[in-house]
Amino acid sequence: LAPRAVRQLLVRLLDIMLAFPDLLLALLAITVLGRGPENTLLAVGLAGIAGYARLVRAQVLQVRLSGYVQHAVALGEPPMVIILRHIVPNTLRPLLVLATVGIGYSILSASALSFLGLGVTPPTAEWGALLSEGRNFLDSAPWVSLLPASVVALSVIAITLLGRRVQTLIAKGGIA
């Protein structure tokens, strides 16, 4: 769709982003954007977008060369129909599975940023900030840190289990 030079530039930019850990990119984005809930979410999202973009690109290239898309082109279907009927649904399936894993990773990243004091600022309650505040009381009141740590862990486990279930449903053909 885009000229070749633009595509190559975007692919190289994605490669550069993938060369760095997501948390490091999120730290960089937080320093540029500033602290706050919206900026934390934006930083975590921007840091992880390269993986999604590469997956979508690879899926589109693979589906575009598949037999059923080639048949649709040969039959004269309009490009928009081919995109909406064949390419988008077959690209969304693996993206949905990756998104469930990404949500768990985003929860951990946002909590880590807040734990370091770079995410959401007090008095807003955030799991990482609660963990950071509770570490001063680990000797006398360990439950202060245990509760937010448990909630973070349980949330990530629940999202991961949901992702596995979605992957199983997709493999069985239960999700279109």
Regions found by a protein language model. Give the residues of each.
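Generic hydrophobic transmembrane alpha-helix motif, especially the helices
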Residues: 1-54, 58-59
